[in-house]
Amino acid sequence: MLASDRRERRVRLEEAFQRESVFKARTVELLRGRADKKNPEFVRAFMAAKQARRDVERHLRLAARVESVEQKARALQARVEAQAAVRGVLDRHRRFTRADFAEALDAAEDALAAGEDRLDDAAALDEDWAGGGAPDEDEGEEADEALLTQWLLEEAEEA
């Protein structure tokens, strides 16, 4: 919609409103002056005021209709722009929208979880071996005795 069209509509509405005000004021003035309702001047003023009132109502309806259409057009334009933005994001991330992507993502996540589980199992084996001593219990006791003996000797040397 051109700005000049909007301005022209506003001017016509304002002119109709001013005409109505002038003729209505003249009609009321004649009534207060006790003019006869058949007086040609009263009839002209009254008929002009009624016509101006219809013009104001018509211009208001037209302005409301145009504004409503413009609002709808702006809403649709915003929706189309939003769709274009969404399309741009989806185009940049096409791989995420493939039909098999969700399955591939789940499979990759499962594979990672399985790898982590295997790593945890391997780390647990290492902890068992490193922290729990040698697999043979007799060898463990001998190692403990040797360690205790070493500590006693070290303490005796210091004294």
Curated annotation (Swiss-Prot):
Domain of life of the source: Viruses
UniProt keyword annotation of rRNA-binding present: no
Keywords: Host cytoplasm, Host nucleus, Virion, Virion tegument
Keyword RNA-binding: no
Location relative to the cell: Virion tegument; Host cytoplasm; Host nucleus
Predominant location category: virion
Gene Ontology CC, one term: host cell nucleus
Disordered: annotated span: 123-145
Pfam families listed in its UniProt record: Herpes_UL14
Functional summary from the UniProt entry: Contributes to the nuclear transport of the viral transcriptional activator VP16 during the early phase of infection. Therefore, participates indirectly in the regulation of the immediate-early gene expression. Additionally, seems to be important for efficient nuclear targeting of capsids.
Family listed: Belongs to the alphaherpesvirinae HHV-1 UL14 protein family.
Protein name: Tegument protein UL14
Organism (species): Suid herpesvirus 1 (strain NIA-3)
Encoding gene (name): UL14
